[in-house]
Design a protein with these regions (language model features):
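Alpha/beta-hydrolase-fold serine-hydrolase catalytic core, especially in secreted/extracellular enzymes
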Residues: 1-118, 128, 194-200, 213, ...
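Alpha-helix capping and helix-loop boundary segments enriched in small/acidic/polar residues
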Residues: 141-149, 179-184, 195-206, 225, ...
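Loop/turn elements at helix/coil->beta-strand transitions in domains of secreted/extracellular proteins
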Residues: 130-131, 157-160, 220-221, 242-246, ...
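Primarily recognizes the serine-hydrolase "nucleophile elbow" in alpha/beta-hydrolase
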Residues: 210-283, 576-650
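Generic beta-strand/beta-sheet core signal
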Residues: 123, 136-137, 164, 225-235, ...
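Cap/lid segment of the alpha/beta-hydrolase catalytic domain
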Residues: 129-216, 252-265, 490-580, 625-630
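Residue-level marker for beta-strand->alpha-helix junctions and adjacent short loops that shape enzyme
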Residues: 168-169, 254, 296-297, 543-544, ...
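N-terminal cap/leader regions of alpha/beta-hydrolase-fold enzymes
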Residues: 199, 238, 302-304, 310-311, ...
Length: 729
């Protein structure tokens, strides 16, 4: 191996791409356990008193709110009783329960955020209320079903009860431009909201807290009780708002380290880095927390509907009572000598009599446990639950669309501290943005501390160049791998520029760098560049294996990481290795990628400044619209690529802002008119911001866009000229 001095022989056999994905899987499983044990580094608890403890955990509570997307100021709740055709709420008897009934039932609506309301049922005790409670069923339960169960029991016990509608797991309305998917409604909203720094969980927490805002006027004790998805909402609402003196969490609490296997609408950026259920419970203390362990909602996956697809896998299973008890004891242990008011109850179903006895005890007898769980018949004329759910779904979708439209202006404010007076000031003042992009959006892993241990082998040779497979260690179980093409005409002592040529989704290095494979959308571009005299390296990126790699993203996100958390150090290691080769010019190393490789072209060079330029092919876009639009048929809201969504990206970095981090280095877009990843108008709109930035810095010649009559493919005309100009010119 004359072109690989000092490189050991590569002896690995089999599918190296599958080996890479499997190794990252092992790494992330270890990291999940390790980081759970390291959470205390984020906590500065003072357990000398409850007052000091409350003050010491305030930053943690704020960070939890950020993780959950609870970041917007609410509007006044303005509770409204909904009037329906043919029924007057002022008329007694015929349309309302009898005077002997322990409570009355009203359909209500209240305001939450601009453009977002809540709808549900208000259960008003006949006697003066002794407490106010928000009761939340599972996502697939209607408020009427909750009123017929523990919600009604709470009202019969003397509580004023508000029961919000939650977005369910059906897929009836999940689609874009008439193209329907089998995504649960919760997933459909999650996708758009997540991209914009919000969450379906956070929106429903806000609905609960808006109810609490309304309850404030009554000056009564307040609590929250929920089952299943409602238990999740209740638990986190109580952790965030100290006005809630009691939380009953049923069918939810337990160890959270397998969050990646739960439905994707529970995926929460960086949650497990700082919070398990025990840590969240510690935010509820010293207030009362009752964990009612009963069978969780049975969810084996997304709806199975003929002709529909695109949903992410994910299931809900019931943990053992021992696992739940262990997590609750861990919560108690976090509080030192402070005595928490936590209780664990085993039950067959949510809202057991034993739970109500516990509520009676902790309320000092104000809330009386019933001998049985009485209910009141629903009055006639209540709004249609399905129509109400549709209104709430449509409204929440439109809420995400309003956020999407506003995002551009939020980003402008976010970027206000970048000084574009001249190139030097631009480079200086964008360093902080690069750091934030890497650490807060991509998720930064520590720099590798193990040697690269390069291994290689020759895999083919042509008249113009020789091809080698190269493997480099990055982290335990994580390696970089790709194909190096070395032209034959390099003179002794000569140093050539390098082009790193990146494949797309489900691709391999061979797709771009092996002349023996069949023609494809890459058109042998690494080989053609090698024929032009460039050294090329074609890495294997880990977006291969369908759900196997997408599960990596699921495991990574709760740790504040992503696929690109691995891809960035892989590429840095590759460039460091290339610099050691005697025929490589380490100052002239460029990037050129198609599709997911184009996605890489705006993210990796934005962080890895050893790349001297970047060419993005078949991916440049108004990326936030692409991910969040509920109108455009090319939106990722309707596809099976559920790993695409990056938390809060929309409010910080669109593709133009990513190119700001590449600037002043040269940057180019290659765009086929027929490429279905976007429309020319979107691409041009976003690129105009890039060109504007380069032009105003006086370096407009460093950025270009080429349109060509073609589909999703490497064109290799203008881009090749761009490489020649900036690497050799």
């Amino acid at each position: 191996m004359e072109h690989l001095p000092g490189v050991k022989p590569l002896t690995w056999k089999g599918d190296l791409a599958a080996r890479m994905v499997a190794g990252m899987d092992r790494y992330l499983r270890r990291a999940t356990a390790e980081r759970a044990a390291q959470r205390e580094r984020y906590w500065k608890r003072d357990t000398t008193s409850w007052e000091r403890h409350e003050k010491s955990i305030a930053p943690n509570r704020k960070r939890l709110a950020k993780c959950l997307g609870v970041v917007d100021d609410r509007v006044p709740a303005d509770m409204q009783v909904v009037a329906w055709a043919g029924t007057s709420l002022d008329r007694p008897s015929a349309e309302r329960p009898s005077e002997a009934a322990p409570y009355t039932i009203h359909a209500v609506r209240w305001h939450v955020l601009p453009g977002l309301t809540a709808e549900g049922l208000l259960l008003e005790p006949t006697a003066p209320a002794v407490a106010n409670v928000v009761a939340l069923g599972d996502a697939d339960q209607t408020p009427e079903q909750v009123a017929d169960g523990f919600g009604g029991a709470l009202a019969a016990s003397g509580c004023r009860v508000l029961i919000p509608t939650l977005i369910n797991r059906d897929c009836e309305w999940s689609g874009v431009a008439g193209i329907l998917t089998n995504q649960p409604h919760r997933e459909f909203i999650y996708r758009a909201a997540y991209e914009l720094g919000r969450h379906v969980i956070g929106a429903e927490i806000q609905k609960v807290l808006a109810a609490v805002d309304w309850f404030d006027q009554f000056r009564l004790p307040m609590g929250v009780m929920g089952y299943g998805e409602g238990g999740l909402i209740a638990f986190n609402a109580a952790a965030l708002d100290t006005r809630l003196g009691l939380a009953v969490v049923s069918g939810y609490f337990g160890p959270r380290e397998k969050l990646f296997a739960e439905p994707i609408y529970r995926n929460t950026w960086r949650l497990l880095e700082e919070f398990g259920d025990a840590e969240i419970a510690s935010l509820v203390a010293p207030r009362f927390l009752i964990v009612e362990h009963c069978p969780f909602p049975a969810v084996s996956g997304p709806p199975q509907v003929e002709g529909r697809s695109g949903a992410a896998p994910g299931a809900i299973t019931t943990p053992s009572v021992a696992a739940v008890e262990k997590e609750l004891k861990r919560a108690m242990g976090l509080l030192g000598d402070l005595p928490p008011s936590f209780g664990l109850i085993e039950a067959d179903a949510p809202g057991s009599l034993l739970t109500f006895e516990f509520i009676q005890e902790v309320s000092g007898g104000a809330v009386c446990a019933p001998d049985e769980l009485p209910t009141v018949p629903l009055p006639p004329g209540l709004p249609d639950p399905q129509a109400r759910l549709k209104r709430q779904f449509d409204e929440m979708v439109e809420w995400t669309q309003a956020l999407m439209r506003e995002a551009e202006y939020v980003r402008r404010d976010y970027w206000a501290k970048a000084d574009a007076t001249d190139v030097k000031l631009w480079e200086k003042t964008t360093k902080a943005y690069r750091k934030r992009f890497h650490e807060e959006v991509i998720g930064a892993l520590p720099a590798p501390d193990m040697p690269p241990n390069p291994r290689g082998r020759q895999v083919f040779a042509t008249e113009a160049y020789t091809g080698y497979e190269v493997v480099l260690d990055v982290y335990p179980d994580v390696f970089a791998y790709g194909i190096l093409l070395v032209p034959h005409d390099i003179a002794p002592g000569e140093r050539r520029p390098v082009v790193v040529c990146q494949h797309g989704l489900e691709g391999r290095p061979q797709d771009v760098a092996d002349p023996r494979i069949e023609e494809n959308c890459y058109h042998y571009f690494a080989c053609r560049l090698a024929q032009r005299g460039f050294v090329t390296f074609s890495p294997q990126n880990p977006y291969i294996g369908m759900d196997k790699f997408r599960v990596l993203q699921r495991m990574a996100n709760p740790l504040g990481l992503s696929l690109f958390s691995f891809i960035i150090p892989q590429h840095q290691r590759i460039l460091d290795f290339l610099k050691t080769l005697p025929y490589v010019d380490g100052k002239r190393m460029a990037f050129y990628g198609l599709s997911y490789g184009g996605k890489t072209a705006v993210r990796v060079p934005a962080v890895v400044t050893d790349y001297c330029l970047s060419v993005c092919s078949g991916d440049f876009n108004e990326w936030i619209w692409k991910n969040a639009s509920a109108r455009a048929p090319l939106s990722y809201l309707r596809t099976g690529e559920y790993e695409m969504f990056e938390f809060d990206l929309g409010m910080t970095f669109n593709y133009a802002e990513m190119t700001y981090l590449i600037c002043p280095r040269p940057f180019m877009v290659e765009r086929g008119h027929w490429d279905g990843v976007s429309w020319d108008e979107w691409v041009s709109y976003e690129f105009a911001k890039t060109r504007y930035r380069y032009d105003l810095l006086g370096i407009g010649e460093r950025t270009e866009i080429e349109y060509f009559n073609g589909p999703h493919e490497i064109n290799g005309v203008g881009a090749f000229a761009f490489l020649e100009k900036h690497l050799r010119g």
